[in-house]
Amino acid sequence: MFKKAAVFTDIHFGLKGNSKTHNLDCENFIDWFIEQAHEHGCESGIFCGDWHHNRNHLNLTTMSATIRSLEKLGSNFDNFFIFTGNHDLYYKDKRDIHSVNFSRHIPGITLINDFYQEDDVALVPWLVDDEWKKIPECKAKYMFGHFELPNFYMNAMVKMPEHGELRNTHFKNQEYVFSGHFHKRQQQRNIHYIGLSLIHI
């Protein structure tokens, strides 16, 4: 699927009431990310969900910053994969309406909106309904997703309680799992929450 990939997550364009400062910080981060990816020989890129912050609407200045950033990513990688996080979805329990659907029209961008596996890599958007049942059955060595797993820190102080069906033990077939969603960088066994792209204060 790829030789070497650069990965980031949870950039949340449009945060702080569509703050121009925040969106500019996001764009500057994208420039830095591309530079680092080139320096480290990454021909592919992956974004692990929550591109936008607001689930209900998109501000035009935020949309403009988003398009500029995705066009940069599409033109600087052989392939750049993006999948939906919960903040990208209009409904939390289904993925039919989301704020990054337009990205599939940008050259170089591959939008993943369903469980996808190629070779030894799986790309998994925000899970809905009983899709969690696919995780224990998946044999991919590497899995990238936007998972809400118990006993990981939701922030610096509070751990996610046990609720829902998905558990850490369901990832028994994966050597490495990389996830967005929780903003604190942390690891338990084979599961890595890669943390914030930049500090959202």
Language-model features and meaning:
Residues F2-K4, I11, L15-Y116, H170-Q174:
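Core catalytic region of metal-dependent phosphoesterases/phosphodiesterases
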Residues A5-V7, I46, L123, Y142-H146, ...:
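Structural motif
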Residues G45, F80-I82, V121, K141, ...:
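Hydrophobic/aromatic residues located in beta-strands of well-ordered beta-sheets
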Residues T66, T84, D88-T169, I194-S197:
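Conserved catalytic scaffold of divalent metal-dependent phosphoesterases
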Residues D10-F13, F144-L149, E175-R185:
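Histidine-centered catalytic micro-motifs
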Residues H53, D130, N151, K184-Q186:
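Glycine-rich nucleotide phosphate-binding loop and flanking beta-alpha elements
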